[in-house]
Amino acid sequence: MTPQLHNELWTSWASLLRSYAAAHGLNAPQHAVVEVSPEHITLRVGSRWLRFTPIAVESSGSPEVDFALLEDGTVQIDDAAAEEMDVAAERFARELLLP
């Protein structure tokens, strides 16, 4: 993957996480904070958090697992089948905001 494509996908991933966190935050007791840098994206809700790097995702309650943004716009998490970025972002936001 080219660095330019990676940057575009990384920015899109952060945007999707922000959008779904905001949407789910409307019905949640707490709102999410999304912190973005070239090295990581962190989604925080109270004491719970998710942290994405270009190669892994970890959470406040689980061990680190493999993570990858793929060239076709899908997300690969650990050994699971790849899924569309928007579907994965919605699921992560929902699970963090509405446990």
Identify the function of each model-found stretch.
Residues 1, 5, 28-29, 83-84:
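Alpha-helix capping and helix-coil boundary motifs
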Residues 1-17:
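Charge-rich, low-complexity N-terminal segments
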Residues 12, 16-23, 95, 99:
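Conserved short hydrophobic interaction patches
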Residues 19, 24-62:
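Amphipathic, interaction-prone secondary-structure segments
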Residues 45-87:
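Intrinsically disordered, low-complexity regulatory segments enriched in Ser/Thr/Pro
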Residues 75-77, 88-99:
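Extended, compositionally biased alpha-helical segments that mediate assembly or anchoring
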